[in-house]
Amino acid sequence: MDMMHLLVGCCGFPVSKSKYFQTFKTVELQDTFYRIPSIDSAKRLKNQVPQEFIINMKAWQVISHPSTSPTWKKAGIKIDKSKAKNYGYLKPTKENFEAWDKVLEIAHIYNPRVIVIQTPPSFGYNELNLKNAQEFFQTISYNNF
């Protein structure tokens, strides 16, 4: 019989990293939802974690949340206003695909097992959202995440 392997971690680091690493083997980064970290910042974090430690991450909110979302304002995201409707809700747009490429760039450093795509409450079920999500996920590269 196969044994299930369960990993338990937190969303972010609620205590110092050195203390966290003594207890947990994985973390889910929430910061990546608000802003994509710089390459240098991502490499610094990756170099701080134990070799077998798993860094999972949330995808950048511009892919899943519309530009009118309060979380965009909180994150201070600036975009060309004429393209605002092209972001969020997993729309299969150039802007969302470019944002996903930025997520992948950081994911190549962290090597997560999971990239969480958090959708807002306003992303309800309807035919358009389903069509957009299907096309988005059929188009993007996963790179084994």
Model-found features: residue ranges?
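Residues lining hydrophobic/aromatic ligand-binding pockets adjacent to catalytic sites
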Residues: 1-145
